[in-house]
Amino acid sequence: MFYNKESDFEDDLVAVLKRHGWTDGVLEYPTEQDLISNWANILFDNNKGIDRLNGQRLTKGEMAQILEQIETLRTPLALNSFINGKTVSIKRDNPKDEAHYGKEISLKIYDRQEIAAGQSRYQIARQPMYPAKNKMLNDRRGDVCLLINGMPVIHIELKKSGIPISQATNQIAKYAHEGVFTGLFRLVQVFVAMNPDDAVYFANPGEGDFNSNYFFHWADFNNEPIAANKHVGQDEWKRFASDLLSIPMAHQLIGFYTVADSADGCLKVLRSYQYQAVNAISDRVRTCKWDEPVPSGTPGRPGGYVWHTTGSGKTMTSFKAAQLIAGSKDADKVIFLMDRIELGTQSLLEYRSFADDADDVQGTENTDVLKAKLASIDPKDTLIVTSIQKMSNIKAGEGHITEEEVKKLAGKRIVFIIDECHRSTFGEMLQDIRRSFPNALYFGFTGTPIHEENRKKGSTTSMVFGDCLHRYSIADGIRDGNVLGFDPYMVLTYRDRDVRQVVALEKAKASTIEEAQADPAKAEVFYHYMDPNQMPMGPMETQAGERIKGIEDYLTSAQYAQGTPHEGKVVEDILDQFPLLSRGNKFHAMLATSSIPEAISYYRLFKERAPQMHVTALFDPNVDNSNGAILKGDALQEIIGDYNELFGKDFIIPTWPKMKKDITARLSHKRPYLTVDQHREEQLDLLIVVDQMLTGFDSKWVNTLYLDKIIDYENIIQAFSRTNRLFGPDKPFGTIRYYRKPHTMKGYIEAAVK
C-alpha cells in the first residue's frame, strides 16, 4: 500500500501494534508530565502491597527521586542496567504511609522474565511531546513511543511512502542533539526509523555519534531482510512490526537482546541473525530431555553448531545464549569454553563487559578453582568461562580429583558452548571432556566450519556437534554491512619472469639460458616451464578436481629465507604503504610471518630501517633446548626491553602473558587505553606475529594485515577477519597485502571465499 500521509501510516501501525500485544492502552498527545503520571500509576498498581507502597500512591517528590536517579545515570548504557535491575529504591515522603515514612523502600519496575505475563504492561504513546531544553527551540513531537510498565523504551520515527528513512534517522539524531531525549526520555533504549517499505532499528547511542553502520534491518531465519526497500508497496512494514515490535519480541529485545557493553562504553542491540542463533540454542536447551539416555557413539549430547562469519559478533551471541540459559534455570551450569589459554583473557573480559554484573561471569584461575565453581550451588557460579585445557583436566586421577567427584559433577545439567569450535574440537582434550561429562549438551560456534573438503582427522563440524542451528555467511555479512569486505593485494617481491626462469633453468639442469638453448633436450624442458600456457605461476585445479602444479610449487623455502632480498622487499613495501593505509597512524596493522626466527628477523629489520615506528612482536614465549632456543631467548629479552622502554612498562619474561594483555588492550583501545587514539606516544603501529592473534582477536582499529606465510581454507578467513570489524567511513574494507608465493595464495584466497 502507498501512503500519501504520514498520519495514515501511523494509524495503521498503531492498529497492527495493538493486535500484537500492545493492549494496555494508547496515550494520545501526552506531555512528559502525562507520561510521568502514567508511570506513577503503574508503579503504584505493581507495588501497592504492604511491604512496598502500603496502598499509598507515590508523591511528586518520590517520582522526582526516581527521575533524579535517571538523570544521574544519564547514559543508555547505565540506564539499561537500571531498567533490567528489576527494582528502584526511594525514600518515602508520603506521610500517609506511616509504616514506611522516612524509610527506604524498593519498587519493582520491570522483570525481563515476565514476558507478556505477570505485571507487565504494554502501552503506546502517540505524538508524545518532547519539551525543548533550549528556549531558542520549539518543543518537539515524536511519532510513536512504546512504553513497557510506563517506561518509554522504544521510540519510532515514521515517514510516508517515498521519503527515505535517512530523513527519519537524521531527525532522531537532530532531536538527540537538541537534548530531546533527556528526563524521562533518557530511558529510550532502541530507536526505529521506518517508512512503509524500509525500516531500521538501532541502540540509543546517547551522547555518542549516530553511526549508520549500526542501523540494522531485521531479517528472517534465512537472513532475508524484512522491510529493506526490496518489495515496494507490499506492506513489508507489517512483517517488521509484527516480528520485531510485537509482544513478546519487544519485551525480550529490551530485557535480553540489548547489551550494555561496559568495555566499549555503549549500548548495543543484537542483529537479527544473532537473535536467531540465541533463540535456536535456548530452544534446544529448553527441550533437552536430560533424563533420557545419550545417543550411542561419541559421549555427550550434540546440541548443534552456529556458523556465523568471523567478525559478526560471535562472542556477544554466545554470551547472550549463555546468559539466557543461565537465567532460565534450564541448566545447572553453562560453560563457555575456549581453545587457547591466551584467548581466555579477551573472551572473559568481553563476557564480563556484556554482563549486568561482572560477578555474574566466573573466570577460573586454575583447575582447583574450576572444580570448586563446578561443584558450587551458588547462582553466581552458573556461568563459567574457562579454557579447553583446564576443562580437560577435570577427570578422575588428574591432580586430586576422584572418580566420585567427577561422577557427582557429571550428574549436573551442564551446557558447553565452545568458541571457535572448528579449531578447538579436533583433539584429545575435547574427547576427555566428553568422557568426563557424557550427559552434557555441547554447542559450537565457528566462522569457518570444517566440511568434507577441509576435514581434519576424519571429523567435520557436524560430526562433532550435530546440525547447523543457524548460518550467517561472510557473503551475508558483507551484503548487510555487518562486516567489511576484504581488499587483497598480491605483492611480487620477485618478478614472475625471474622466478619462472630460475625454475626453468633448474628443471632443464642448465646454469644459463644459453646453456639451455644449446641442448635440444634441455631447451624443450626450459621452454615448457617458461611458457605460461603450459605452466601457470600458481597451482591450478581441473574440473575433475585434479591438482596441476604451478611454477611456485617448485620454489624451495630458501627463496624466502632470512637474509634474502624477499625480506627486505616486504619491509620496503610495508614502510611505503603504512602511512597511507594507516591513515596517518590512526589504524594499526599486523604482519604474519612463517616462523619465530622470521618474526625476530623482521622485528630487527624494522628497528633498523624505521626506528620511528612503534613495532613489537608476539609469539610463543616458551624457550626449550631445541635449535634456535638461544636466539629466541635473546630476542624475547630484546623485544620486552624495547616495549618497556617505548611505553614505560616493566614486563619480564615470566610476565609475558601480562604483556600480551597489554598489547591486546592497546590494539583494541580497551581499558586502560580507551583514548589511546589521542595519544600518539601510546600507540602501537605494527604487531608482528606467527600464529598468535590470527584467530579470536578483535579490534576495529586494525585495518591491515601484511601476510608473509602460506595459509589456506578456514585459516585464510580467520586471519583476514582480523581486519574486517566495522569502524566508519575511514575504514571501507580490510586491506590484505600478501607476499609469499603470491600466485599460490591468490588461488587459495579465491577457494576460501567461495
Regions found by a protein language model. Name each.
Residues 1-333, 342, 346-357, 379-380, ...:
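ATP-dependent helicase/translocase motor core
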Residues 231-233, 455-586, 603-608:
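Interdomain helical connector at the RecA1-RecA2 junction of SF1/SF2 helicase-like NTPases
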Residues 309-310, 420-424, 436-454, 481:
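Conserved helicase ATPase motor motifs in RecA-like P-loop NTPase domains
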Residues 353-399:
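Inter-Walker segment of RecA-like/P-loop motor cores
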Residues 383-418, 423-432, 670, 689-691:
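Conserved RecA-like ASCE ATPase "motif II neighborhood" in helicase/translocase motors
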Residues 535-689:
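Conserved C-terminal RecA-like helicase domain
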Residues 686-689, 693-718, 734-738:
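A short beta-strand element within the Helicase C-terminal
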Residues 722-753:
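Conserved segment of the helicase C-terminal RecA-like domain
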